[in-house]
C-alpha cells in the first residue's frame, strides 16, 4: 500500500494555479501532492548572440530550490559561487523539453526564460517543473499574441513529465520522496500530449530491471502523463 493510498498507476492530486505572481508574462504554481513549484515565464526582446540574425527565437529555463524546500535547510547555491551539477542538469532538461514543443522560427527573435523555483519538495520536482513550465510558457505566448507581437502560436502542444519506479514487485507512478528514496528503479519520463517521447532518464538503484519491466514503466508513465495533460488543458480554460 502506498503512503497516501493511491493506486500504483495513479498520479498525486495535481493543482495548477495560473497568474500566480503579478509581473511575469506567464506565472504558474504547480502542485503534485506536497511538491510545489513556482514557474515564471519572462519575455525578452532579442536572442543569444549565437542566434542573432537567424530570425529564430529561443526558450530556456533555470531551476532552483529554496533553502527550506526540504526537511532540513540547504545553503543557497549562490553562497557557493556556482550552481551544482544536479541543478544544471535539471534546468537543461526543462529547457530541452519545452523547446521540443515550440516552433522556434515562428517566435521571431524573442527569448523566453522559464524560472522554476521549488518551494516545497516531496519527490518529482523536475517533472513538476516541466509540467508547470509548459503552462507558464503557453500563457507567455498568449500574452505575445494579445499584444500583436506574434500572429500565430509557436507552441505545438503541451509537454508533461512524470516519475515512475519499481519498489519491490510494484511499478509505481509519480513517486513521492519516501517511495523514491526506497525504489529499486527510478525513472523520469517526458512526453508530448500525443504520447511521443522527449526524454527518458532511468537508473537501477538496486536490482537491474528487465526489458519487460521497462515497457511496463513506460506504459504507466504514458497513462500518468495523459492524466497530467488533462489537468494542464483544464487549467488553461480558467
Swiss-Prot record:
It catalyses: tRNA(n+1) + phosphate = tRNA(n) + a ribonucleoside 5'-diphosphate. PROSITE patterns: RIBONUCLEASE_PH. GO terms for molecular function: 3'-5'-RNA exonuclease activity; RNA binding; tRNA binding; tRNA nucleotidyltransferase activity. Keywords: Nucleotidyltransferase, RNA-binding, rRNA processing, Transferase, tRNA processing, tRNA-binding. This is Ribonuclease PH. Phosphorolytic 3'-5' exoribonuclease that plays an important role in tRNA 3'-end maturation. Removes nucleotide residues following the 3'-CCA terminus of tRNAs; can also add nucleotides to the ends of RNA molecules by using nucleoside diphosphates as substrates, but this may not be physiologically important. Probably plays a role in initiation of 16S rRNA degradation (leading to ribosome degradation) during starvation. It is an enzyme of class 2 (transferase). Belongs to the RNase PH family. Phosphate binds at residues 86, 124-126. GO terms for biological process: rRNA catabolic process; rRNA processing; tRNA processing. PANTHER family: EXOSOME COMPLEX COMPONENT, EXOSOME COMPLEX COMPONENT RRP41. Pfam families: RNase_PH, RNase_PH_C. It comes from Vibrio cholerae serotype O1 (strain ATCC 39315 / El Tor Inaba N16961). Its EC number is 2.7.7.56. Homohexameric ring arranged as a trimer of dimers. Disulfide bonds: none annotated.
Amino acid at each position: 500500500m502506498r503512503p497516501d493510498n493511491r493506486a500504483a498507476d495513479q498520479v498525486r492530486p495535481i493543482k495548477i494555479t495560473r497568474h500566480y505572481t503579478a509581473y511575469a508574462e506567464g506565472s504558474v504554481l504547480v502542485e503534485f501532492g506536497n511538491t510545489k513549484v513556482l514557474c515564471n515565464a519572462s519575455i525578452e526582446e532579442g536572442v543569444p548572440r549565437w542566434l542573432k540574425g537567424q530570425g529564430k527565437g529561443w526558450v530556456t529555463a533555470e531551476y532552483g530550490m529554496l533553502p527550506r524546500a526540504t526537511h532540513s535547510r540547504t545553503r543557497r547555491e549562490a553562497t557557493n559561487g556556482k550552481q551544482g551539477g544536479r541543478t544544471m542538469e535539471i534546468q537543461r532538461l526543462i529547457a530541452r523539453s519545452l523547446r521540443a514543443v515550440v516552433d522556434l522560427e515562428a517566435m521571431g527573435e524573442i527569448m523566453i526564460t522559464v524560472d522554476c523555483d521549488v518551494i516545497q519538495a516531496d519527490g518529482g520536482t523536475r517533472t513538476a517543473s516541466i509540467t508547470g513550465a509548459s503552462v507558464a510558457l503557453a500563457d507567455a505566448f498568449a500574452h505575445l499574441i494579445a499584444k500583436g507581437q506574434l500572429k500565430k502560436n509557436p507552441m505545438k502542444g503541451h509537454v508533461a513529465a512524470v516519475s515512475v519506479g519499481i519498489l519491490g514487485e510494484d511499478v509505481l507512478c509519480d513517486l513521492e520522496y519516501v517511495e523514491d528514496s526506497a525504489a529499486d528503479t527510478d525513472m523520469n519520463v517526458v512526453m508530448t500530449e500525443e504520447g511521443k517521447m522527449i526524454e527518458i532518464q532511468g537508473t537501477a538503484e538496486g536490482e537491474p530491471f528487465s526489458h519487460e519491466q521497462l515497457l511496463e514503466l513506460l506504459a504507466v508513465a504514458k497513462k500518468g502523463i495523459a492524466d497530467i495533460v488533462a489537468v494542464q488543458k483544464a487549467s488553461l480554460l480558467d
